[in-house]
Amino acid sequence: MVNMAAPATEHVRNIVLVGQDGAGKTSLAEAMLHVSGRTPRMGTTHDGKSYLDYDQEEIRRKFTLGTSVAPIPYHDYKINLLDTSGHPDFIGDTLATMQAAEMALFVVDAVAGPQVMTTKLWREAEGMRLSRAVFINHIDREHANFDTIMAQLHARFGSRLGPVTIPIGVAEDFKGVIDVLRMKARYFDQDGTTDDRIEDIPAEYAEAAQIARDRLCDLVAEADDDLMMKYLDGSEQLTQEELESLLDKAIAQELFIPVYVGSTIIEQGIRCVMKDICTYFPHPRHHGAFRLANGEETFVDEDGEPAAFVFKTVADPFVGRLSYLKLISGVLTPSMELINARTGKKDRLGHLYVMMGKEATDVKSAKAGDIIVVPKLTDTRAGDTLSQSGTMSIDPLPLPVPQYPVAIEAANKKEEDKVGTFLTRAVENDPTLRVARNEQTHQTIVTAMGEAQVETLLARMKEQAKVEARLVPVRIPYRETITKTAEAQGRHKKQTGGAGQFGDCWLRISPNPGEGYEFSDEVKGGAIPGGLIPAVDKGVQEAMAEGFLAGYPMVDIKCAVFDGSYHSVDSNEMAFKTAARIGFRAACEQAGAILLEPMATMDIVVTEEYAGTVMGDIATRRGRIVGTDSTDEGETVIMVRVPYAEVISYPKDLRAMTRGSGSYYIELEGYDPAPADVTKKLVEAYQASKA
């Protein structure tokens, strides 16, 4: 049995399970755990008894929300399974985890086939130069069709995919697989816990098996130039020994992408995958170069200085803060000091854990290539690099930018600080969350990937921080301005028996497009003492902050005070501030005040079949198409300019229009005059709120 604490680098296999939500990634991991003897039963998500989906929200929703690690000792190897979410709202966590693996095993449903997230994550894996394999799951289900799914995989991902197992029967007739690599039939027992029964290939499957075998040899031969030439000119066939000796190289070089088939629920077809993971899937030293921030590269090296890359952090309610590390070089031991390249601070490692779901096991050391978990690294975040010298800094993968803004407030105003503290911690744990305070609208804005991520955030806040928060409508940061020059007097006089108040000023306001607020003193002959002029300026700015039409701050205005009068006893700063506010509002009555709405530019990426629908939808949102382009993958890029208020909920709307395949990037870009109907609606709402 392999040493789970510190296996040799070449005996580690880091496999990330990826694919569409519901394809069976977690059930594949649970089946591997059970078949290997790691767990006494197969955990299942649907009944809340999964070893890996243990979070309360995962149990409630019945799907994976974040990465869980499942280390499996199998023969002389340690397989680190990284079970990830297939939900688009949690793609950031999935992408970060993919950096820690040498192999991405895509799980595809035998009925639904490759779906939107399958395609998105496949492209990401290609960009990372991550080796890939496919497991076609649920082949025992009604309407399952192996040939159809293989055709879809070839059409979407190319011709380098090839089956290494072929089902013997489908749906209720599924009873085994053809092992194309070894050209044998493997029949299963009832529960998958004993070795498969090996027999000769049935005659009716001989032709399909030979076609798959020939294709396998064609692709694998490319891994050796000399053998390829002999093979292609027909002078030699690959021997079994040559095929098996080249297969790991072909997979690591992405020349061949193996496809397996089975059913996780009945634990069939699992042993073939696990055996090949150990024998042919790449080990950590096969990983390509890690790009460093200084432009150099580094590789997994057991003899190098101790260094690790943090791919995930979580706040565990029982253990505290946990950091998930992929060891890049050297050996880690408890009490070792490492320096965070981002902060320059030293962190002393306490315990080293091997995690299995939520269960932590202490280990005494960990070697390069392995995955380990360290508690209580207080200022460490996902994407950080820790090393003994502090000079190594691995470039983290750029993660998707969140585009879904919501406003959050505490259900009890007295608990606003608790909400803020929890949100700060949540952002540290999830790099696809953003939290900011909008000083104009006085709202806390959380920007996320989508609704499910926000709902999960609120549920965890209630569970972990014991505080409830609620969503409220996002206030759009409208502004107001003027379009004409106008003059008006502001006069304030108040007499109450003692010292009174008197202020009198004449103001001229005019548009100042794009230049902000400017104030000037044009008073002649001491009509207003110089010491009171700043009070006029303050009064104007206070009036602008309150707005004129609908309570939104006013911008881009020049204001000059050019005349007035004062009283030697009753004039003071307060009186002239009040007079200035009166005068400013009076001038606005004549200055053509208008409402400004924030505008956004968007690059929307969709497949051609949805381009027309999306363009039509943008028109209904008062948007304007400013151009189109295409991606290397043949998708359409639609460039638009649209009022920001019209696209607040765009993530879920685009997902609905494109069946989850569309994506976009948005930036705020200036302000435009709001149309009359929008202005009327906002003015009426403002007046009603004051009534």
Which residues are covered by each model-predicted region?
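Structural and coupling elements of P-loop NTPases
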Residues: 1-691
